[in-house]
Curated annotation (Swiss-Prot):
The keyword Ribosomal protein applies. Residues 60-71 have a biased composition (Basic residues). It comes from Bacillus cereus (strain ATCC 14579 / DSM 31 / CCUG 7414 / JCM 2152 / NBRC 15305 / NCIMB 9373 / NCTC 2599 / NRRL B-3711). One of the primary rRNA binding proteins, this protein initially binds near the 5'-end of the 23S rRNA. It is important during the early stages of 50S assembly. It makes multiple contacts with different domains of the 23S rRNA in the assembled 50S subunit and ribosome. Forms part of the polypeptide exit tunnel. GO terms for biological process: translation. It comes from the Bacteria. This is Large ribosomal subunit protein uL4. Belongs to the universal ribosomal protein uL4 family.
Amino acid sequence: MPKVTVYNQTGSQVGEIELAEAIFGIEPNEAVLFEAVMMQRASLRQGTHKVKTRSEVRGGGRKPWRQKGTGRARQGSIRSPQWRGGGTVFGPTPRSYAYKLPKKVRRLAIKSALATKVVENNIVVLEDLVLNAPKTKDMLAVLKGLTVEKKALIVTADANESVELSARNIPGVTVITADGVNVLDVLHHDKLIMTKAAVEKVEEVLA
C-alpha cells in the first residue's frame, strides 16, 4: 500500500496515511486515460455549428430563366448549391458530441489518474481544511505552507463554501468535492491536494 505524509493547514507533518492499493497503487493505464480525457473533452464541445440548406436560405423560389433557348445552362433556382449565396449540401448541423465509455473503463481511468499522482509524488493529503471565512489570503497561506506553487486541485469530502470562495480568485487552483473527482481535472493540475475525509470517501466509492 502506498504511504503518504499527512499535513496540517500550516504545512507541518502530523502523520501518515496508507492509501488503498487497488486505487492509488495500480499501474496507470495510459490508453484508458486517453480515452477518458477524449470523452470528457467531447462532452464540453458546444456543437452549435449550423449552415443553411437550399430550403432555408432566402429567395430562389422562381426559376431564373426558361429551360430552353437561352444558350445558358439550365437552372431551377438561384439558391442551388452551385450558386453564390446558395444553400450548403451536407453542411454541419447542431449536434451533441457527448458519448460515454463503459462504467468499468471510467472507474479504471479515475483510478489510473489518482495512481499517476502518487507515482509522480504530486499528491498531498491534509488532515483537514477549515477556513472560518472566505478569504483568498487564508487560502494562499495554506498553499504556501504546503509549498504548492503550480496548478492545484483541492478535493474536499463535501461542499465547503468558504474553501471554494477563498480559492476562486487564485489562478490555477480548482476546488471540487470527492463525488466530482474526474480524470480531466486530476491530470490538468500539477498537484492533487486531498483532505483525509476526501480520500476515505473516494476509496469508499471506487473500492
